[in-house]
Structures are given as C-alpha cells and as structure tokens.
Amino acid sequence: MAHFDLPLDELRTWRSRSVEPEDFDVFWADTLAEARGHELGARYEPVETGLRTVEVYDVTFAGFGGHPVKGWLVVPAGARDPLPLVVEFVGYGGGRGLPHTHLLWASAGFAHFVMDTRGQGSGWAGGATADPVGSAPAYPGFLTRGIEDPHAYYYRRVFTDAVRAVEAARAHPLTDAARTAVTGVSQGGGITLAVGALVPDVVAIAPDVPFLCDFPRATTITDRVPYREVGHYLKTHRGSVERVAGTLAYFDGVHFAARGRAPALFSVALEDLTCPPSTVFAAFNAYAGPSKAIEVYDFNDHEGGGPFQEQVQLRWLAVLLTD
C-alpha cells in the first residue's frame, strides 16, 4: 500500500477532533479507586523453562473487579539486586505467549514484565486470562464490547488491569519501582499511553505504532480491522453513533497523551492501514511530557520498525533507566 494518509508535513501538525469528556479525570480516578479496593494479591511462581540466561516467574494479580490476570516476569539469571523495570503490553488478539519469546529486555539487564490481555490470546500468541464480564451485543472482536456505556466498555477493564500490572511488577523485590518504563506495540502502544497518564511516576513510555488513538479519524479513514469493527457495529446500531463516540472518548490515546508526564518515544509507519499515521501523530502531537520523539518508517505497514525500533528503544531506555 502506498502512502494514503496526510503528507508528512501535515501529519506533524495534525490535531484530533476527539472531544474530551468533562469528567475524564474523575472517571479514571473512580475506576482505579474501585480496583484498588481489591487486594493486589500478586503471586510469583518460578517456572522451569530450560533457559539458562534468564529466570521466569508466572505471575497472577488482581486486576479490574479483582479478577485474576496473568503475566510473566523475566529477569537476568542470578540477579540479586533490584533492576530497572520494563512493563510491556501486547498487541490485539494476542496473549503473553511463551516465556522464551520474551528475552530482549532481560538480555539487556532489565526486569521485564509482560501482561496478559484479558479475553484475548487466541489470535497469534496464547493467553491465559479470562474476561468474566459479559457485555451487550457486540461485533466480533473486542473493540465494540460494551461500547455504548463507558463503564461497561471492554477497555475500561484492560486499562485498569494495566495499571495494576505495573503495581504487581513493582511489588517484586527484583524490580526497582523508581526506574519503571512501559511499552507496547499496536494495542500495547495504546495501553502504554493510558498507563503513562494513569501512573504518574513512570520514568519513560515507548508506544510503538499505537492503536486506540484519535477514534474519530481512525474509524473513518481505514477499512482494516480492528477499527473497522466500530463501523460494522454502527451499520446495525444506526442510532448509536453519538453514544459510541461518547464512550470512545474516555479511551482515546489522544486524551491520555495530553496527560503524559514522562519522556516518550513513539513510532509510526506511513503505510500503516491498521493504525493510520494521522492517528498516531494525533497522540504524538498532543503529548504533554517533558520530551518526546517519533521514529518514522516511510515504507512500512503495521509491522512498523520491528527490530529496528527495538534497537532504538534499547539505546533510549539505557540512558533513561540506567545512567
């Protein structure tokens, strides 16, 4: 697919038309207070993986509603002192997968926590976390589950799980809470933006080709799922356009970006039909942290920079978390 979105010079000034709810901050403060009414109950069970360079823990903690959420904690073998921590959120449809697929950050000397995504994990990497909450009728996928009520919306649970995942990761004695970064690709990047706003003391965030940004633009510019799930839903629920837009505004990465407090490293791919460039730049341009940078991959689709972006992230986080 050739370039289809705005020219790069216009992308650098693009601003979302998403309208921020007046009670955005109250909504999220109340949501997290409700979640913290449940004991975190983080449990770490050592796992024998056959890997010699890392040690792995199977983690369970209480997320939204006190529901059990899984994760992996991967640390360098033999680590005895608290390590800088990277918390990672995974892409749409995937789960935490198998431990041996998560070696990058521990190999660089970091503690690495990978959160499973509730109800997902059957698309491309296995998951182990159920979503026990039902919803009103939805289009197949996750993006429209509970979409007519922000309190019932699927991503309210996921974003809350993610905040609790940071708390669970920080509770382990081999992690240094004062040196915590969050990252993720696609859906994981959108979750990263939310956590960067909802956990004010993270040191850095690295959203990679982030999903869940600039919904008014995203749901009308691309035919590719997941965003297209919203259009398919509204084909049937014709009278729900305003209610759906109102719900999505509580979960738009643009509004979380406006509350960012940490240095941020974004990435964008100019041929990305899944997370169109203008939606990523909408979040980047709104980002309010003390510093920000964006890597632009001119001829890539949703794979983005892949290992090239990981290389950039490694150098960037080495400065922020270890110097």
Language-model region placement:
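Cap/lid segment of the alpha/beta-hydrolase catalytic domain
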Residues: 97, 103-104, 108-160
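Gly/Ser-rich "nucleophile elbow"/oxyanion-hole loop immediately N-terminal to the catalytic nucleophile
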Residues: 141-186
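Hydrolase active-site cap/lid region
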Residues: 193-239, 296
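Short beta-strand/loop motif that positions the catalytic acidic residue
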Residues: 260, 266-268
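C-terminal catalytic histidine-bearing segment of alpha/beta-hydrolase fold enzymes
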Residues: 281-323
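Short beta-strand element of the alpha/beta-hydrolase
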Residues: 71-75, 81-93, 112
